[in-house]
Swiss-Prot record:
Residues 36-44 are annotated as: Switch-I. The gene is ran. This is GTP-binding nuclear protein Ran. The record marks Q68 as: Essential for GTP hydrolysis. GTP binds at residues 17-24, 35-41, 67, 121-124, 149-151. Residues 210-215 are annotated as: Interaction with RANBP1. It comes from the Eukaryota. The lineage of its organism: Eukaryota, Metazoa, Chordata, Craniata, Vertebrata. It catalyses: GTP + H2O = GDP + phosphate + H(+). Keywords: Cytoplasm, Developmental protein, GTP-binding, Hydrolase, Magnesium, Metal-binding, Nucleotide-binding, Nucleus, Protein transport, Transport.
Length: 215
């Protein structure tokens, strides 16, 4: 096992409101779920997620909070030495998007210039409340954004690929094979996916609103 261990490893912190699907998302990667370790002192699970790229294997040690965010903020020990992050919200819950700036503020207070991906989860659910046109925080803060659906595996690899390109410094980096993922629990409607991709493209070409607040 040891000789196959990827040389390139990154600490990735997964943050966002409770119930947005962070644990569901990280558990999709089967070997990471099988090999996860619980860090009792911080109350976190660390999932080792390996991806095979055209530049060799890389491993994200993904820190998942095990639900403590429901009791307020996370301790600095969770963020310290993080090299990248995913902030997650639930597109069916406006309040989880409204809280994104708080998560971002806590993160950058401890980790100044790390690459961050914002993910809107549960896009498989028809009753979407947070539409593409209202998702602007990432544009103001220079983050990447993806719609995802953890339960259907839709766009699962996208945040990891974007982060890998930033961390390795190679915009042409590609995944040469996909990790084994848990079978989809639901199917993402391809028509809906195409519509959302179109909506995001249109939104990205629209001027940002003028107001100065965080949303």
């Amino acid at each position: 096992m040891a000789e196959n261990e990827p040389q390139v490893q990154f600490k990735l912190v997964l943050v966002g409101d409770g119930g947005t699907g962070k644990t569901t998302f990280v558990k999709r990667h089967l070997t990471g779920e099988f090999e996860k370790k619980y860090v009792a002192t911080l109350g976190v699970e660390v999932h080792p997620l390996v991806f095979h790229t055209n530049r060799g294997a890389i491993k994200y040690n993904v820190w998942d909070t095990a639900g403590q965010e429901k009791f307020g903020g996370l301790r600095d020990g969770y963020y310290i030495q993080a090299q990248c992050a995913i902030i997650m919200f639930d597109v069916t819950s406006r309040v989880t998007y409204k809280n994104v700036p708080n998560w971002h503020r806590d993160l950058v207070r401890v980790c100044e210039n790390i690459p961050i991906v914002l993910c809107g989860n549960k896009v498989d659910i028809k009753d979407r409340k947070v539409k593409a046109k209202s998702i602007v925080f990432h544009r103001k803060k220079n983050l990447q954004y993806y719609d995802i659906s953890a339960k259907s595996n839709y766009n699962f690899e996208k945040p990891f690929l974007w982060l890998a390109r930033k961390l390795i410094g190679d915009p042409n980096l590609e995944f040469v094979e996909m990790p084994a993922l848990a079978p989809p629990e639901i199917a993402m409607d391809p028509t809906l996916a195409a519509q959302y991709e179109h909506d995001l493209k249109v939104a990205s070409e629209t001027a940002l609103p003028d107001e100065d607040d965080d949303l």
